[in-house]
């Protein structure tokens, strides 16, 4: 009887371990969402991932955020949470980007997101981002 109970417990332990391993494997090999591809493509197009990148119009960081963009984020939040130095932080730049997008583009439409992020950019800007998304999708 003890041997059967031991075998049953061992079997359950092995099953649980395999189940946990499958969950971890799925998490590791999960394909990125369209939005994640878009954000990564945008970062590449804007700065090639350089947190210290400086553009020609006082735009800086991985997402080339302008002072007006920081003002808009703080306006949305109703208080001054972010400052101009935060543009140099990838993490804070992404937070600001998500705040603007969630406020103006809650459905996460990529075309609208591109226009919101850089309203003065032409069609070629959107084409560059979408090409980069396609490239990232194949990696």
Each language-model region and where it sits:
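Alpha-helical scaffolds flanking conserved acidic
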Residues: 34-41, 107-116
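Export/targeting segments at the very N-terminus of extracytoplasmic proteins
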Residues: 2-7, 11-51, 76-77, 90-102, ...
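Alpha-helical segment that forms one wall of the substrate-binding/catalytic cleft
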Residues: 67-112, 121-136
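Alpha-helical elements of the RecA-like P-loop NTPase motor core of helicases
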Residues: 51-52, 127
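Residues that flank catalytic or metal-binding motifs in active/ligand-binding sites
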Residues: 38, 58-61, 125
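Short, flexible beta-strand-to-coil junctions
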Residues: 2, 118-120
